Regions:
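PLP-dependent class I/II
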Residues: 1-165
């Protein structure tokens, strides 16, 4: 369960409050007391935040470096250097190539399915965020995976791309 707060325009907060009033999603008293106590521990919070950031940077860097290594090997991929958040912007564009079973990769959906089915990796196409083009741009999250997960996934991604002809 999460304990949190929101800050924003009065009309937005009022609408949020009216929704929450009907959801019954209030945090139990024990969690509220524990959160209040935690907020008094500035050093503890800073240590926690520092560790979280360090882990995110490590995972983003590993994923970016892996994608760039594939690019250097001539695979049809690229990634933008991470600048924050928990997402890496990647381009996976093997358009026109065929899967081992003869399917031509023609759309971002084809790429998404290839990575999911052959590498066990989920990606979100930029179309989900309103980007109109079907040109291989995706978002990959490192928020819920470990460094080891990334290190194990990269070879599978490479194998999936190398399986195309």
């Amino acid at each position: 369960m999460r304990v949190g707060w929101a800050v924003g325009p009065v009309d937005v907060i009022d609408r949020m409050s009216s929704i929450l009033g009907h959801v019954g999603a209030w945090a139990p008293r024990a969690e509220q007391v524990a959160t209040a106590k935690l907020l008094d521990d500035a050093a503890g919070i800073q240590t926690y935040v520092t560790e979280i950031k360090r882990g995110i940077v490590s995972r983003l860097s590993a994923l970016h470096e892996g994608i760039q290594a594939f690019k250097a090997q001539g695979l049809p991929v690229d990634s933008l250097s991470p600048e924050g958040a928990i997402y890496l912007t990647v381009r996976v564009a093997p358009f026109g190539k065929k899967t081992p079973d003869g399917k031509v990769i023609a759309t971002n959906e084809d790429v998404r399915k290839l990575l999911l089915d052959r590498a066990g990796v989920g990606v979100v196409a930029f179309q989900a965020f309103g980007y109109p083009d079907d040109d291989g741009w995706f978002r990959m999250s490192v928020g819920a995976v470990s460094l080891r997960d990334i290190q194990e996934a990269l070879p599978r991604i490479g194998e999936a791309l190398r399986s195309l002809s």
